[in-house]
Amino acid sequence: MSKSKNKVASYAIIGFGNIGQALAKAFARKGIEVSVATTRDPESFASAAAAIGPTIIPTTLAEAVKADVIFLAVRFESHPDVARALPTWQGKIIVDVTNAYGVSPEKLGGQPSSRVVAQAFTGGKLVKGFNHLVAAVLEQDPAVRGGRRVAFLASDDDGAAAEIDALAENLGFSPIKLGGLSEGGLLVQARGNSWGQLIFNDLVKFD
C-alpha cells in the first residue's frame, strides 16, 4: 500500500466483542485513533467505546471499511458478510484476527483459514496476526517484566507485513514474522479440532 510521507494510515476494527475490544484497548493505550464497527448501529456500543478511550471512534460498517488498515475481529463464519461491504479491497490491508473454531479442514478446502479469508477480500492484502492471543491476554499492556509481548504475523505480501510489523511495534508488541500464509498461517491457526503449534502461546521477548 503506497501512501505519501505526510499521510498517516487510518485504522478500523470490525467486530467489537472480546477480541475487538481488546484490540481497541491496545490502540487507546498508545493514543492511536481507530474506528470500531459492527453490523449494529454504532449508538448501541458507543458507551463501551467511550469507556475504553477518546481515540476509539464508534461508526458504521460502511464508514469503517474506508480505513487503510482493517482488523477483522469477527467470528470466522462472519467474514464473508464483512467482505461484501466493498466490491474491491484494493489498496487495503486486512489483518485477520479470526480463528476457525469448529470449521472442518474439508470446509476450508484443505487450505489455511487465513487463505480462505484472503480470497474473500478481493484485491486486499491480508496479514494474519494477533489471533494467537486470547482476549484476556491481548487486552493487557504488552510491556511485561521489562520485555514485550510477542505478536506473530504471517502474510504473502512483504509490504503489508512490514506495515503491520511497524504498527505492532507502535502498539508496544514485539512482532515476529512467520513467513507466508501457507507456512506461518498454519502455525497460528485454530481450525476444526486441530491447533497450530503457536496458537494461544503467550510469549515475551526481551531485547
Predicted regions and their residues:
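Rossmann-like NAD(P)-binding element
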Residues: G53-T55, T59-I93, V97-G102
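A glycine-biased structural micro-motif
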Residues: V8, K66, G91, G123-L126
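Active-site-lining helix/loop region of Rossmann-like oxidoreductase modules
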Residues: A22, R148-D207
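Structural/interface elements that position substrates and couple domains in central-metabolism enzymes
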Residues: S35, P105-L108, S174
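Rossmann-fold NAD(P)-binding glycine/threonine-rich loop
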Residues: T98-V144
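General beta-strand structural signal in soluble alpha/beta enzymes
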Residues: P58, K125-N131, I176-G180
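NAD(P)+-binding Rossmann beta1-loop-alpha1 motif at the extreme N-terminus of oxidoreductases
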Residues: S2-S47, A51
